[in-house]
Swiss-Prot record:
Regions annotated as coiled coil: none
BP GO terms, sorted: translation
Classification lineage: Bacteria, Pseudomonadati, Pseudomonadota, Alphaproteobacteria, Rickettsiales
Protein's recorded name: Small ribosomal subunit protein uS17
Pfam families for the chain: Ribosomal_S17 (PF00366)
Organism: Rickettsia peacockii (strain Rustic)
Length: 77
């Protein structure tokens, strides 16, 4: 099964080797036909501590690194 890749924005980089990434998605509501924006936060592994708040990054699914981290930052802008 291919690994999922998501794009988002770093909203916290306070923890060591960990960043919190906010991923937003839009979809059309099936009944009301209005576009709805939904966001979710992911804890991602940043081994070099090189990403700061506000950076746009891509994260990829990986094996569990800790209790809450199952994503790794692969690149940023």
């Amino acid at each position: 099964m291919p690994k999922r890749v998501l794009q988002g924005v770093v909203i916290s980089s306070k923890a060591d080797k960990t960043v919190t990434v906010k991923v937003e998605r839009k979809f059309k509501h099936p009944i009301y036909k209005k576009f709805v924006k939904v966001s979710k936060k992911y804890a991602a592994h940043d081994s070099e501590n090189k990403y700061q708040e506000g950076d746009k990054v891509s994260i990829i699914e990986s094996r569990p690194i800790s209790k809450t981290k199952t994503w790794v930052v692969v690149n940023g802008e």
